């Protein structure tokens, strides 16, 4: 069984037991969180597609950790002006483990 749900403006395809990195959520480590914006739920035989959401669809997950991703380097450069600027960015994330999918 798998589901597609929406969180942080992105869609994620998950199954029970999967670990997913989402945009940062203000939830403490070890707590349970429910995602109700479920777009699709499928088991071996049937597929429930929402219009736009599946009625009664819910994905339950446990928060494992919070952290920051790999550094992305940004370089701005102006030719012939002796001007260059180098910056970096590390995006915060929340890592969750999917515990249940309800249709």
From Swiss-Prot:
Keyword Nuclease: no
InterPro entries documented for this protein: bL21-like, bL21-like_sf, Ribosomal_bL21, Ribosomal_bL21_CS
GO cellular component terms attached to this protein's record: cytoplasm; ribonucleoprotein complex; ribosome
GO biological process: translation
UniProt KW keywords: Ribonucleoprotein, Ribosomal protein, RNA-binding, rRNA-binding
GO molecular function: rRNA binding; structural constituent of ribosome
Pfam families attached to this UniProt entry: Ribosomal_L21p
Subunit structure: Part of the 50S ribosomal subunit. Contacts protein L20.
UniProt record similarity statement: Belongs to the bacterial ribosomal protein bL21 family.
Protein task: This protein binds to 23S rRNA in the presence of protein L20.
Protein name per Swiss-Prot or TrEMBL: Large ribosomal subunit protein bL21
Species assigned in the record: Shewanella loihica (strain ATCC BAA-1088 / PV-4)
């Amino acid at each position: 069984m798998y589901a597609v749900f929406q969180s942080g403006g992105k869609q994620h395809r998950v199954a029970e037991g999967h670990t997913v990195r989402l945009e940062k959520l203000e939830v403490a480590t070890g707590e349970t969180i429910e995602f109700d914006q479920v777009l699709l739920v499928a088991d071996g035989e049937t597929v429930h597609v929402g219009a736009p959401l599946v009625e009664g669809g819910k994905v339950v997950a446990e928060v494992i950790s919070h952290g920051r991703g790999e550094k992305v380097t940004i370089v701005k450069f102006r030719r012939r002006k002796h001007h260059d600027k180098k910056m970096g960015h590390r995006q915060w994330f929340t890592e969750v483990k999917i515990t249940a999918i309800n249709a």
